[in-house]
Every structure is written in C-alpha cells, then in structure tokens.
Amino acid sequence: MMAGCGEIDHSINMLPTNRKANESCSNTAPSLTVPECAICLQTCVHPVSLPCKHVFCYLCVKGASWLGKRCALCRQEIPEDFLDKPTLLSPEELKAASRGNGEYAWYYEGRNGWWQYDERTSRELEDAFSKGKKSTEMLIAGFLYVADLENMVQYRRNEHGRRRKIKRDIIDIPKKGVAGLRLDCDANTVNLARESSADGADSVPAQSGASVQSSSVRPLTSVDGQLTSPATPSPDAGTSLEDSFAHLQLGGDSIAERSHRGEGEEEHESPSSGRVPAPDTSIEETESDASSDSEDVSALVAQHSLTQQRLLVPNPSQTVSDRSVAAGGTVSVRSRRPDGQCTVTEV
C-alpha cells in the first residue's frame, strides 16, 4: 500500500551516505551560468536586467514592451528609454556575438544598414539552409516570423504584407549591431541621429522661426469696408460732429438737386465734391411731418421738424453758401435718434 504524502520522511538519515548534510545542492548539480527567460522559457539570449531586477532576453522585453510597458513578472513599469539604453548583464557577449563562431552569419535588412541575427536564430536559419528547406519559422520578440529561404525575405506569419530582406554573408561585413542591440562604437552617433530625426528635434529651430514670423503679422482689419493693416493708422475716429453734419447736409442738398435733373445728368456732376450722397430719407421725412400734427408730439419736436423741413426743401436757385449766409452763418442739421425722435444741432 502506498504511503500518503504526509507519511514521507525527509529526514537527514534518508540522504545517501556519500553526501554530507551541510553540502549545498549547487554542488550536486551544475550551476546555470545563463539565466532563463520567463517569457520564452529558454535560456536568455543577450540578457538584460530591468529596474525591478528581473532578467529577460532583450528581444523578449522588446516584444513585451510593445504590448505594455510593464515587467512580465511584477508588472512594474518599464522606462521609456530602456530599449535604447538597456542594462546588459554581459556586454562582452554582444561583441563576441558580432564576431561570430563561424565563417558565415545571417542578417536582416534595417534602415541604412544590416542587423545580424542573434545566435539562436542564426543557428535555426543555418540548420534549415543546410538541410535545403524552402522556409522556416522563427520566434522573434514574441512574434512568429517566416523566413523564405528561396526569395530571402522574412515576414510575420499572420501579416505577409510587411517583408524584410535577409541574407547569408560573411561574419566580418559592416553591420549596425546584433538583434537590435547597437555596437558600442556606433552608439553615440546613432543616438544623436535618433534624437534629431525620430522626435523632430532637428526641425524645431526652423519651426520656431516661422512661428515667430507668422505671429508678428496680424490679419487685416476692415474699417468701413476698406482693409487696413495694423501698421496703417485707421481713419480719424475723432472726426468732429460738425464735419459729419455738414456731410449729411450736403448729401441732402445733392439729392434735392438731382430730383430736378434729367436722367444721366448725374454723370456730369463736378468731381471736386468727392462725397458720397446720403441715402434717400424722403419716407422718414414724410412720417416725421405727419407726426408733427398729432397731439402726442411735443411742441419741441414739431419745431425741430419744421426747421428740418426748411433746411431739406431749399430754393433750387439758392446755393449752399447763400443759405448759410441767410441763416446768419448757422447751419442746423437734423439727426434721428433710435426712438424715432428728431433733434436739431446747431453748428
């Protein structure tokens, strides 16, 4: 009858006689010099240490960071610049991998150069190539890729549209790095190029200059239907009331004079006047005259309307200067209020 789990005796007497009690387990089994990755469940290739001290393959961390910027074990956030500046446990292995163990190595195309595959993927590609296979699958950064050894391209198994060239070449050709990790000799220059191109920092000075120039130019403003720039002084807003009333008076006179002219005679009007005639107010004048006869209108309004009637219905043979002299040098002009009442201002 089998004994239960609780009946098993794990005492020191159960140990073999050739093993001492104080002997550690590491002496009985070979120690693992390369840590294991908790993502791919294999020995780490180019192991990196996160700020939380967990160790993974560089490509495994890269693939996990695309899905979420957190550690796969403790869920602590991964810094944004970790992929550009990873903490390698053994930087010397990267240089050794770039030198390679054989005569040939496998590369995939990058921007402005070639990247060397990591050691594990290179062994898989070399094994498939030596066996004459047409294609093989690779697990890279958490994604399954298909390497077409006939056309020498690679693509994701679930996305055939994105293809990248691959090649088998000698180990000593110029390269950007290994498995996305740049070599030390190119790190400084490449980081500067990345900072000036990826984030648009190189275009900031030009954009700032353009923005200052564009902000200094204000849009044109409209004054009485005419476009004026901010630098151009606007028309004098403090024009005296006398000029405005004189303008209205001359406009009324021109309307009265044009009523006695034939059609087409307005074209021969003297250009020295240079003034735009005021709109026709005959209807308003008629309404004001009719309201002066009602009992609700005050005597002051009636007096103003009579004065305006005398001004707006002049003798055709009398000029403006004659009327001004006859009135003793005083010109009275009617102005209409918003409430419909009329006032007369003496100039």
From Swiss-Prot:
Phosphoserine, modified sites: 288, 292
Predominant place of localization: cytoplasm
Entry keywords, A to Z: Cytoplasm, Isopeptide bond, Metal-binding, Phosphoprotein, Transferase, Ubl conjugation, Ubl conjugation pathway, Wnt signaling pathway, Zinc, Zinc-finger
GO molecular function, one term: zinc ion binding
Pfam families: WWE (PF02825), zf-C3HC4_3 (PF13920)
Composition bias type Acidic residues, residue spans: 282-296
SMART domains in alphabetical order: RING, WWE
EC number(s) stated in the UniProt entry for this protein: 2.3.2.27
Catalytic activity: S-ubiquitinyl-[E2 ubiquitin-conjugating enzyme]-L-cysteine + [acceptor protein]-L-lysine = [E2 ubiquitin-conjugating enzyme]-L-cysteine + N(6)-ubiquitinyl-[acceptor protein]-L-lysine
Glycyl lysine isopeptide (Lys-Gly) (interchain with G-Cter in ubiquitin) cross-link site: 85, 95, 131, 176
Domain WWE: 92-168
One of the protein's GO biological processes: Wnt signaling pathway
Ranges of Low complexity composition bias in the record: 203-217
Modification(s) after translation: Ubiquitinated; autoubiquitinated. Autoubiquitination is enhanced upon poly(ADP-ribose)-binding.
InterPro entries according to UniProt: RING-HC_RNF146, RNF146, WWE-dom_subgr, WWE_dom, WWE_dom_sf, Znf_RING, Znf_RING/FYVE/PHD, Znf_RING_CS
Assembly with partners or alone: Interacts with poly-ADP-ribosylated AXIN1, AXIN2, BLZF1 and CASC3.
Name of the protein described by the UniProt record: E3 ubiquitin-protein ligase RNF146-B
Gene transcribed to yield this protein: RNF146B
